[in-house]
Amino acid sequence: MYLSMFYTLLVPCVSILNENFSPTSIMENMSSPATGLQPIRCKAAVCRKPGEPLVMEEIMVAPPMGHEVRIRIICTSLCHSDLIVWKMKDPPGIVPRILGHEAIGVVESVGKDVKEVKEGDTVIPTFMADCGECKDCLSNKSNLCSKFPFSVSPGMPRDGTTRFKDLNGEIINHFLFVSSFTEYTVVDVANVVKVDPTIPPNRACLLSCGVSTGVGAAWRTANVEKGSTVAIFGIGSIGLAVAEGARLCGATKIIGIDINSDKFETAKKFGVTEFVNSGSLGNKSVSEVINEMTDGGADYCFECVGLPSLVHEAYACCRQGWGKTIVLGVHKPGSQLSFDSLDVLHLGKTLIGSLFGGLKTKSDIPILLKWYTDKKLELDKFVTHEMSFEDINKAFNLLIEGKCLRCVMWMNK
C-alpha cells in the first residue's frame, strides 16, 4: 500500500463501468412504492473535482431496492485507495462521487427481498460480495464471488444505477459498492456483514478493508505456519496488517522491507522482528540479503507495494521447494510479470494473488472480530487518529503527509 493503495484492490481485468448504468434511472427510483420508504436528506463529503478538497454538502439518498440495505453510518476510516481514486482524472476515476469503503453502521431500512438483516442491525459494508449462492461463494476454495464480481463501477452491483443525487437533481456516483463518506448509504445485501453491536465501532470499521486484507493474506491465503519465516515487502498499513496476521499464526521471524527506516519502530509493535532498508544495500539486491538472513529463503514473502520488480524480488527470496509469494499490491493495469520457465519448473515455488486476504466476508469477518474481543487481534494500534466527519479533509492531509495509519471519523462527534 505504498505506490498505489487503490491498485491493491484491483485485479488485472477489472470492470470499470457497468454497461447497464443509466443516469436517468436513479431519478425514477428516488422513492419506493413497494415499501413506502422515502429518500433521506443527509450530509455527505462529495468529491467534485479530482485532487481537490471534498465538499461537505447535503444530498438525497434513495430508499433501498429489493436486495439492498440503507445504512446509517456510525464511523468510517480512510484508506489509501480513497486517496488514489480522489486524485484520478481518468477512469476508473469519475466525479461527482462519494468515496469511502471502510465503515460500520446501523441498518435504517431494507428492500423487500432482504431476509439476512433487519432494521436496527449493526453491519459492516464491504467491497467484496459474498452472495452465498454462486459456485465460488459455496466453495471453501475461493472468496471471489462470480455473481457479483469485484468492480470499480460507479453504480450498484445489480443494475449499475446510483442511489445518490444532490439537491439540484444531479446524480452522484458510488465507490466500491460502499460509499461511506456520507451519513447514509445504500449497499447490496451481498456486501453487508452483520456484526456484534457491542464491539467498538471505531475498531470494527477497520475490518471493511485494510486490516482484513493483510491479516487474511497471512492467515487464509498463505496459511502461515507456526515457527516459519516471513518477509514483507512494504510496511505501510497493509504490510503491518500482514505482520499482525503472521504474528497471530505463530511466525518466529518476520522481516520488514522498506525504504524508510523510520517505520521499523512502529513495525515492531505489529510483530516485525527484523528490518531491511532496501535503499541502502549497496551492490546487493533485496532478495540476496533475505536469502542470506534466512539461510536459503523465507517460507512466505508478501509483496505489499505494487511494483512488478518487487514481485520478482519476493519470488527470488522465497524458499525453494515450498516457499510462497503472495501478491497484495498490483501495479497499474497492463503491467507484466515474466519468469524463467525453468525456474518455475525446477524450484517448486508458489506465486499467488490475494484479494481481501482471501477472506469470505460473512464468515471470516466475525472470526476476526472474535479474535479482537479475545484480545488476540490487536486493532487499537492501527488507529492513530480519530476526528469528526466534518474534518475529513484534515484526515486526507494526514494521509498525504504520511502521518497516520488509520484515521477514524465519527459521524456525530
Regions found by a protein language model. Give the residues of each.
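NAD(P)H dinucleotide-binding glycine-rich loop of Rossmann-like/cofactor-binding domains
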Residues: 131-233, 281
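C-terminal hydrophobic helical "lid"/dimerization subdomain
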Residues: 4, 20-40, 289, 296, ...
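Glycine-rich beta-strand-centered segment in the early N-terminal region that forms part
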Residues: 62-76, 89-138, 143, 151, ...
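N-terminal Rossmann-fold NAD(P) dinucleotide-binding loop
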Residues: 239-240
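Glycine-rich phosphate-binding loop and adjacent beta-alpha segment
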Residues: 250-251, 261, 268, 273, ...
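Adenosine-nucleotide cofactor-binding segment
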Residues: 226, 232-235, 247-313, 334
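Short Gly/Pro-enriched turn/cap motifs at secondary-structure boundaries
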Residues: 35, 60-61, 94-100, 172-177, ...
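Short, flexible surface segments
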Residues: 116-119, 213, 226, 321
